[in-house]
Design a protein with these regions (language model features):
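C-terminal catalytic/substrate-binding lobe primarily of soluble NAD(P)-dependent oxidoreductases
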Residues: 10-257
Length: 259
């Protein structure tokens, strides 16, 4: 498992990695959390069924990360998605972007399309989709710049502009009533990316509240949990804040469905 993430056991020990946090990258929880942050800060939206993790090299990003209707694998334009560095059979993809960040963009005019060609950008066959990327996201080094930017210039690296996406607790295995959920990176649940309209409409249980709570109902592996499935302490500050956020920012259609 460590190898699949690009680290070996010695490197993990040297870095003092938290096993649960580390596992949250491998089980899909952390990609869902980060995609939610991007979605809520930009207005890009998730696919109805969340992340698909299509296998993709850097060169193939403009081909794969475009709508299905145009030959790609995305549900719609303006979607958040994560590229897998492994093929479905476990084979490593050469020149992958496991540790990096990227954005695929579309030319909106013929002039822009011509610029892609003239500047020799990597594009899809139509010449309209291209990509910008960094193969390495230097997390520990970059966070200091964000802190300084906020403190000195009052300028955030990113902040929410709306409630577009959510991360919902989903069963890793069949769960029985009475079991205690152990949260992000644990043995019981992982986080799945949901459109916020879907999550709030269903009364879904956020991954962030799925720690040290008792299960009230049997849950099948792969089933996403709801508030009704667990014994939730409504007096907790985190629960109160989440409920307030849902009241204030949930899409109108979801509020009606939840009533």
């Amino acid at each position: 498992m460590l190898f699949r993430s690009g680290l070996n056991e010695e490197q993990a020990k040297r870095g003092g990695l938290n096993p649960k946090m580390f596992n949250s990258f491998l089980d899909g929880s952390k990609p869902a959390i980060e995609s939610t942050a991007v979605s809520n800060a930009t207005g890009l939206t998730p696919a109805p069924d969340g992340l698909a993790f299509p296998p993709c090299s850097v060169e193939d990003l403009p081909f794969v990360m475009r709508p299905i209707s145009e030959g790609g694998q995305l549900h719609h334009k303006g979607q958040v998605e994560v590229a897998s560095s492994l093929e479905k059979d476990g084979r490593a993809i050469p020149y992958e972007i496991r540790k990096g960040v990227w954005v695929v963009f579309e030319a909106s005019t013929e002039y822009q399309k011509n610029c892609f060609e003239e500047y020799m950008l990597q594009t899809d066959p139509s010449g309209r989709y291209s990509v910008m990327y960094k193969r390495w996201h230097l997390i520990g080094l970059e966070v200091g710049m964000s802190v300084a930017s906020v403190g000195l210039r009052k300028e955030p690296t990113g902040c929410p502009i709306g409630f577009h996406a959510d991360v919902i607790a989903t069963a890793k295995r069949d769960l029985k009533p009475g079991e205690m959920l152990d949260g992000e990176g644990g043995y019981t649940v992982y986080g799945k990316l949901f459109p916020s309209e879907k999550s709030t409409g269903l009364g879904s249980l956020p991954l962030g509240l799925a720690h040290n709570v008792k299960l009230l109902k049997p849950i099948k592996a792969g089933q996403s949990l709801t508030y009704a499935d667990v014994q939730m302490d409504e007096s907790l500050t985190a629960v109160k804040l989440r409920r307030e956020m849902e009241r204030l920012f949930a899409p109108a259609a979801a509020k009606i469905a939840a009533q």
